[in-house]
Curated annotation (Swiss-Prot):
Gene name of this polypeptide: recA
Keywords, ordered alphabetically: ATP-binding, Cytoplasm, DNA damage, DNA recombination, DNA repair, DNA-binding, Nucleotide-binding, SOS response
Function of the molecule: Can catalyze the hydrolysis of ATP in the presence of single-stranded DNA, the ATP-dependent uptake of single-stranded DNA by duplex DNA, and the ATP-dependent hybridization of homologous single-stranded DNAs. It interacts with LexA causing its activation and leading to its autocatalytic cleavage.
Family indicated by similarity: Belongs to the RecA family.
Molecular-function annotations in GO: ATP binding; ATP hydrolysis activity; ATP-dependent DNA damage sensor activity; damaged DNA binding; single-stranded DNA binding
Principal location class: cytoplasm
Protein name: Protein RecA
GO cellular component, one term: cytosol
Domain of life: Bacteria
GO biological process assignments: DNA recombination; DNA repair; SOS response
KW Cytoplasm (keyword) present: yes
Length: 347
């Protein structure tokens, strides 16, 4: 429908005035501007990249990764850092918990020599550092570990029994209001790692769990990922890792509520080879005959762990199978679910 000529002139004049005050591009017609594809940073997990709908976590947005203790939150975040660095990105890790394991980060592929690290004393200090490095325009990804450890200065300076109701929530709300627009402008991704707490006096319907830091992060986050440990992985009666499930509970860039399962191996992180086997079998790309797994005419190994070991050594073969999986899933509207039962016994 055609717009009235007088209205067109009035709007054009207003746009010129706005551009003069706030800079060119402050107000544009969508028809005059090409819609850009949302870029993403891989999570290091094939299944989670697919579940997120765009191949990873979106750039220039706020991401929240939360779950119980030892569920894989920091491991997943370190994998995202490693993937970002592989593509030439500059990353920062704000270690509010003062618990970053540098040697473990190296094992996951993080370039620790070029990783910017801060261990702030207070929540205010952490968020000031976050704002400063983001406004610099030279950073691609910042991880804050964790929201629960962003302790306000008033609480640190006060006595042990003092009450500081809502102080951390107000701190987070203020920081997010300031930083959200800057993140978009600088195309910087911000990941908050968060913990869960039980709601006091929770009765009736609804989840008894909540995350720390108030409600602001729930609103400002474009993506929220709930990660949980669902099983232990054993080999020869020895615990070698955990099976984790990640659910995308909020997604502003693709359909939400998709899930992914993957192995987190002790000392190694997310097993990409395990996901290749799981999706390969589900999509009939990898053949499973009894305990034996094979791809085309090549035997991958007897048992899942042996097949994983072979794919870990043969990167070219792993990449070839991964490509076939992506091509197969890409032809479908829905993400292919993982097998209903794991390929090897877990507990």
């Amino acid at each position: 429908m055609a717009i009235d000529e007088d209205k067109q002139k009035a709007i054009s004049l207003a746009i010129k005035q706005i551009d003069k005050v706030f800079g060119k591009g402050a107000l544009v017609r969508l028809g005059d501007k090409q819609v850009e594809k949302i870029d993403a940073i891989s999570t290091g997990s094939l299944g989670l990249d697919l579940a997120l709908g765009i191949g990873g976590v979106p750039k220039g947005r706020i991401i929240e990764i939360y779950g119980p203790e030892s569920s894989g939150k920091t491991t997943l975040s370190l994998h995202i850092i490693a993937e970002c660095q592989k593509n030439g990105g500059v990353c920062a890790f704000i270690d509010a918990e003062h618990a970053l394991d540098v040697y473990y980060a190296k094992r996951l592929g993080v370039d620790t020599e070029n990783l910017l690290v801060s261990q702030p004393s207070t929540g205010e200090e952490a968020l000031e550092i976050l704002e400063t490095i983001t406004r610099s325009g030279g950073i691609d990804l910042v991880v804050v570990d964790s929201v629960a450890a962003l302790t306000p200065k008033a609480e640190i300076d006060g006595d042990m029994g003092d009450q500081h109701v809502g102080l951390q929530a107000r701190l987070m709300s203020h920081a997010l209001r300031k930083i959200t627009g800057v993140l978009h402008k600088m195309n910087t991704t911000l990941i908050f790692i968060n913990q869960i707490r039980m709601k006091i006096g929770m009765m009736g319907y609804g989840s008894p769990e909540t995350t720390t830091g108030g409600n602001a992060l729930k609103f400002y986050a474009s993506v929220r990922i709930d990660i949980r440990r669902i099983a232990s992985l054993k080999q020869n009666e020895q615990h070698i890792g955990n099976r984790a499930k990640a659910k995308v509970v909020k997604n502003k860039v693709a359909p939400p509520f998709r899930e992914a399962e993957f192995d987190i191996m002790f000392g190694e992180g997310i097993s990409k080879e395990g996901e290749i086997i799981d999706y390969g079998v589900k999509l009939d790309i990898v053949d499973k005959s009894g305990a034996w797994l094979s791809y085309q005419d090549k035997k991958l190994g007897q048992g899942r762990e042996n097949a994983k070991a072979l794919l870990k050594e043969d990167k070219a073969l792993a990449d070839e199978i991964t490509l076939k999986i992506k091509e197969s899933i890409g032809s479908n509207e829905e993400i292919m679910p993982l097998p209903d039962e794991p390929l090897e016994e877990m507990e």
